């Protein structure tokens, strides 16, 4: 069996996803217990306990989720549709959250209020390879001292332009979200592993100072570990956090089971218009407190690090031992009940 480096995966002939690869532990691990593996990191000047950011979707990150993730040492990006945003920006307090998403047409007065609260800004668009995104980023960075996240991209060719515009971090992934139908509807997109590696290598080769957010396609703590091992600074989660107590919306009881709504940002439920739809809407099982999900991610990530002999995330990002899985090899690892 061939053991692949990042560079070899990057030049692989096919587009790869998380399910196509696996990490290979080749060293004798010196980690006695997974508790020795540290998942803390620094993202755009913020200290995180776990490298997790919530997606600014209206069914994932409202004010309650943003505050709780902040308390847990993660980042929740308050979605731009949230009804509490105006009162939050006009209040004297407004603390407890770290980031807010905006649209391309968000006015400078609103942005100024966001900056005064010392929040990060996420320009929430489906495609950052767009001159309007570059123009908005440049406008914000020239006028304000604030960290700006842009997205999304699937290839690294535009990193130079994004850096010139002042972007501090970029969301990587087009069409890979669980309720996103962009790739099907438009024919656009690359497997997340291939996207991450392409952008990671271009960033390093050209010494571009933009942080990488792996956004989409992550279904498990193992996928989080893979994303970090592939060079991501943090991961952005939607589906994994959906259905938790802190997500917006009511808990619904149906057939004796508790559920909550989960939908894509370009779904009909969000747009409420009969225009081109690139997202789905569904119900997910109620999961209880988001703390349980974050704890599970932290435990799984630490366990992966202990296998890989990595005491911290910087060491995990230096991973150069990967396997490409056949379909049968992937199916073999699934539980058989």
Task: Describe the role of every protein-language-model region.
Residues 1-211, 241-244:
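Active-site entrance/lid segments in N-terminal catalytic domains of soluble metabolic enzymes
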Residues 1-29, 165, 187-214, 218-337:
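Alpha/beta catalytic cores of nucleotide-metabolism and tRNA/nucleoside-modifying enzymes
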